[in-house]
């Protein structure tokens, strides 16, 4: 491992020391809590939607979340190790066969739905 990779790994450890990032994949419905600064006030804003892309690039890792707000599709890109991310919660696992779900941009209504991954629930039941 070269020096730059080593520094990146140390920085990732420092940034994730006080928070846990759950494993998630494209197709999952997530709730991302973001720290928003408005003037001198700081508050947490929840952003819930479907992960349509995930980019794993070490410290530069990011993911795109898409939601429908007032009938209009809204996408937001989040940096995975950003200090502005308060937390990420996986609400529902999606069963998809693609790594990038950009085709959801052209779809609306029932055709934009994603099937739920059932094997995720079976493992929880088997563990109990």
From Swiss-Prot:
It comes from Ralstonia nicotianae (strain ATCC BAA-1114 / GMI1000). The keyword Ribosomal protein applies. It holds the Pfam family Ribosomal_L19. The keyword Disulfide bond does not apply. This is Large ribosomal subunit protein bL19. This protein is located at the 30S-50S ribosomal subunit interface and may play a role in the structure and function of the aminoacyl-tRNA binding site. One of its GO terms (biological process) is translation. Gene3D superfamilies: 2.30.30.790. Keywords: Ribonucleoprotein, Ribosomal protein. Belongs to the bacterial ribosomal protein bL19 family. Signal peptide: none annotated. One of its GO terms (cellular component) is cytosolic large ribosomal subunit. GO terms for molecular function: structural constituent of ribosome.
